[in-house]
Every structure is written in structure tokens, then in C-alpha cells.
């Protein structure tokens, strides 16, 4: 890859640092999409011993690229995102990916197809971590930053997504315990 090509990719990806998510950090500022993606990858790194049969390098690659489409559309909270929003994001992302140099355009297109199909252990794990990271972040944010629907959503979000793994079911239960304690405490 030529240096100018790499710089063009990085300049585009940099926009994820400015795309904010619905959630807040513990310091009361909106979390960026880049921060969410980073911590999803950090989760994958630390869970490699729990999933020895899973290609964790692939899960980390999925985590790194999973929200790049939000460069073009911004972040839309899951409870507001429509199928049309998803299609627009996917279309704009595919247009950008097609401009990338080989073999990266092919690799990314294949990863996105695998992620969307949710048929492999890697895709299932990436998706579970994506959702779990969001709930963990909400638990870390001040309660007064939550929208009304998040009190129930944060108790159930990702429950279906983690069902394939006993470890993730236990992790989700631990996260729910934190959510319940946060709500009771009122902070």
C-alpha cells in the first residue's frame, strides 16, 4: 500500500473519533464510536482463554471495523435505528470499502459478510461483545444520562445474543447485577 493510500484511509477513519454514541462516559461526556470499538477489541483480547477454539484475531479485526459505516451516517441508537438506516449505512460503507486497495477491500467485504450472517463463532462472539460493551458503558455512565427506555433495555439487551456461550451468559448476568444495583442506588 502506498503511503498516500494509507493516509487517506486513516483520515477517513479518524472521523470515528468525532462520531458520538448515545452513551456517556463516567466523566459525563458522550462516548465516541472509536472508544466503543477500542473497548470491544480489548474485551476480545482478554477473553481469548475463554474461547480457545475461536480465532480471536479475527474477532478483533471485526471489532475494529464493525462501526466504520457510522463515519458516513453517524451513530443511531439501537432503539431508534430502522432497517432503512441500516441499509443506508451498509451501502455507504460498501462504496467506501470498494475504493480500498487490494487485498484490504476483499478482506473487509468478506468480514462484513461474515459479521452480517452471524453464522461463525467469531461473528457471534463479536456481536455479543459489541452489545455487552454498550451495556457496560451505560452502567459506567451517570444514571441521569439514561433515557427512560434504558432502565428496562439495559436489563435485557444482548441476552439473546450471548445464549450460545455459557461464559457470556454468566458475564451478561454479572452485568445485569451491576445494572440492577445502579438503578437501586440511583446513581
PLM feature spans:
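Active-site helical microenvironments for divalent-metal-assisted chemistry
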Residues: 1-187
Amino acid at each position: 500500500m502506498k503511503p498516500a493510500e494509507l493516509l487517506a484511509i486513516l483520515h477517513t477513519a479518524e472521523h470515528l473519533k468525532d462520531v458520538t454514541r448515545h452513551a456517556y462516559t463516567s466523566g459525563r461526556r458522550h462516548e465516541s464510536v472509536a472508544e466503543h470499538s477500542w473497548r470491544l477489541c480489548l474485551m476480545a483480547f482478554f477473553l481469548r482463554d475463554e474461547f480457545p477454539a475461536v480465532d480471536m484475531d479475527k474477532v478483533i479485526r471485526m471489532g475494529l471495523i464493525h462501526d466504520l459505516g457510522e463515519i458516513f451516517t453517524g451513530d443511531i441508537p439501537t432503539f431508534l435505528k430502522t432497517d432503512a438506516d441500516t441499509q443506508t449505512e451498509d451501502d455507504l460503507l460498501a462504496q467506501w470499502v470498494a475504493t480500498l486497495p487490494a487485498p484490504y477491500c476483499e478482506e473487509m467485504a468478506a468480514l462484513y459478510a461474515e459479521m452480517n450472517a452471524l453464522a461463525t463463532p467469531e461473528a457471534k462472539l463479536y456481536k455479543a461483545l459489541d452489545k455487552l460493551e454498550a451495556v457496560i458503558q451505560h452502567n459506567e455512565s451517570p444514571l441521569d444520562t439514561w433515557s427512560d427506555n434504558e432502565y428496562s433495555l439495559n436489563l435485557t439487551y444482548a441476552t439473546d445474543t450471548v445464549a450460545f456461550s455459557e461464559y457470556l451468559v454468566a458475564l451478561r448476568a454479572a452485568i445485569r447485577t451491576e445494572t440492577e444495583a445502579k438503578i437501586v442506588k440511583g446513581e
